[in-house]
């Protein structure tokens, strides 16, 4: 199989990378009706598999889970999750031939084996669904001509997909139809109904492409979402301890600081996050972020280039074939880091202290978000897609670090994201070593000294923050989500 993106000519590549349209609410007036009365069989019962299935069932769809015979015989976790929630469970051979829509929600590295197992069992004219397009775009999986191939990609972990649905809302979602597999022209109707069944239409849906989803998703998770948080955690912890800060305090400031800082990001973008700082601290964070962007721009560009060319996927799939040797080695190295093993700290850190003592962390978030966004735009990805794959998902990833440090983040994200995270963070840490020696008092674990504020300089900084393109598109998208949430709650 050949990388699908690399088989396209330049015009086709640019067209698919740039596919992104914010869909209006009235396009979902039919909600999930197109799939009602049809059989939906989900393969995989992990976080996305279970929680999407629960939402779809609550939306009136007929849901069953197809598992491998050994998973059923051995009553594995996937079997227990499905049966304990009252779902029909059966083997591929028993359920797949009945399915009008087969939804593949297994991990990326299992996709080829799963698709090759289910495809011969699928009836003529059925549909195959994904929530991430890696198998189609990077692996280049060929699907039978009569099968419609669609994608519904919630921009949140599976648990969040369920919780937002239970609140009467949903999570922002990308949908797409594979242009090589839509013989009956019903792909968009299927994708819209599936998205509505998960609640995504109540939070905002982008009509995208498999290519745009994969390339932007890989870029976001490797750089700002995971790689930058991991590199920042390791660097900031080691710096504080070397400067004599109590290890427990340093660890807690980082572990819970990312979540606190990015909560402001979620509510009001980079503007609100920076507004949580004093004026001298804001000016210092801005200066630090500009330095960081200059240093790291080549690394962000390299990751984007390797994603676009397919080099990243080729390298990672070679590690799959080598029993994940690199992935498992890097995971072990991360687990042995000083930050992962810092002593518990019983003292209290106030919400504002996370900002006041985490000026460098704020700068890292700002630099990483803007660099990821700008680099995606330069590669032809549309602003809305770039926003969702950089700023929007960052608070969700930061929350995993707050739970159990980097270990939890790397367990929750996909193996694909984890592999890319290590590539980025292991390059970023040495790249920023010299920069870390230039830090001043107040950049970490102390307040920035108040040495006066230049009004004109502050004015220019505020204007630069607010006029960055991610702030402009972010304000629009957050406003839409807020409006939709009000409608959902009112209903």
Curated annotation (Swiss-Prot):
An example Gene Ontology molecular-function term: ketol-acid reductoisomerase activity
Cofactor note: Binds 2 magnesium ions per subunit.
Chain ranges of the KARI N-terminal Rossmann domain: 17-208
Keyword Metal-binding found: yes
Keywords: Amino-acid biosynthesis, Branched-chain amino acid biosynthesis, Magnesium, Metal-binding, NADP, Oxidoreductase, Repeat
Pfam families in the cross-refs: KARI_C, KARI_N
Keyword Lipid metabolism: no
Source domain of life: Bacteria
Binding of substrate, residues: 414
InterPro entries: 6-PGluconate_DH-like_C_sf, 6PGD_dom2, KARI, KARI_C, KARI_N, NAD(P)-bd_dom_sf
Record's signal peptide: none
Record-annotated KARI C-terminal knotted domain positions: 209-344, 345-484
Binding site for NADP(+): 45-48, 68, 76, 78, 108-110, 158
Protein name per its UniProtKB record: Ketol-acid reductoisomerase (NADP(+))
Organism field: Proteus mirabilis (strain HI4320)
């Amino acid at each position: 199989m050949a990388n699908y993106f690399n088989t396209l000519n330049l015009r086709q590549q640019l067209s698919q990378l740039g596919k992104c349209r914010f869909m209006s609410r009235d396009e979902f007036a039919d909600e999930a009706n197109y799939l009602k009365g049809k059989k939906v069989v989900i393969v995989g019962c992990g976080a996305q598999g279970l929680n999407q299935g629960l939402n779809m069932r609550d939306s009136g769809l007929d849901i069953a889970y197809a598992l491998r015979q050994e998973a059923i015989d051995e009553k594995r976790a996937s079997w227990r999750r499905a049966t304990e929630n009252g779902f029909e469970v059966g083997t591929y051979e028993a359920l797949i031939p009945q399915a009008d829509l087969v939804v593949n929600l297994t991990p990326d590295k299992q996709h080829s084996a799963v698709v090759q197992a289910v495809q011969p069992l699928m009836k003529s004219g059925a549909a195959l669904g994904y929530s991430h397009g890696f198998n189609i775009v990077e692996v280049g999986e060929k699907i039978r001509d009569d099968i419609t191939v669609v994608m519904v990609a919630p921009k949140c972990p599976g648990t969040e997909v369920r919780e937002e649905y239970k609140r009467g809302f949903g999570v922002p979602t990308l949908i797409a139809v594979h242009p090589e597999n839509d013989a009956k022209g019903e792909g968009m109707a299927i994708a819209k109904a599936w998205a509505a069944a998960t609640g995504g239409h109540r939070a905002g849906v982008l009509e995208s492409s498999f290519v745009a989803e994969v390339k932007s998703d890989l870029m976001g998770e490797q750089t700002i979402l995971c790689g930058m948080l991991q590199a920042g955690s390791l660097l900031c912890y080691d710096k504080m301890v070397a400067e004599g800060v109590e290890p427990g305090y340093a660890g807690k400031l980082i572990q819970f600081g990312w979540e606190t800082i990015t909560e402001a990001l979620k509510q009001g973008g980079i503007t609100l996050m920076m507004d949580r700082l004093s004026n001298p601290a804001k000016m210092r964070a801005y200066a630090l972020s500009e330095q960081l962007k200059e240093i790291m721009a080549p690394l962000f560009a390299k990751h984007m280039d390797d994603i676009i060319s397919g080099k990243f996927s080729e390298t990672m799939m070679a590690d799959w074939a080598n029993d994940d040797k690199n992935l498992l080695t890097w995971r072990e190295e991360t687990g042995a880091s000083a930050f992962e093993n810092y002593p518990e700290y019983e003292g209290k850190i106030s919400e504002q202290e996370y900002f006041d003592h985490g000026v460098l962390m704020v700068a890292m978030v700002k630099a990483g978000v803007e660099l990821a966004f700008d680099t995606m735009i330069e590669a032809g990805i549309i602003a809305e897609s770039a926003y969702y794959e950089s700023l929007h998902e960052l608070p969700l990833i930061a929350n995993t670090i707050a739970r159990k440090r980097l270990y939890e983040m790397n367990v929750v994200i996909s193996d694909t994201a984890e592999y890319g995270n290590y590539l980025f963070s292991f390059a970023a840490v040495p790249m920023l070593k010299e920069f870390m020696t230039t830090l001043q008092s107040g950049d970490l674990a102390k307040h920035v000294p108040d040495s006066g504020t230049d009004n004109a300089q502050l004015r220019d900084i505020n204007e630069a923050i607010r006029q960055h393109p991610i702030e402009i598109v972010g304000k629009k998208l957050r406003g839409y989500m807020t409006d939709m949430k009000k409608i959902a709650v009112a209903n």
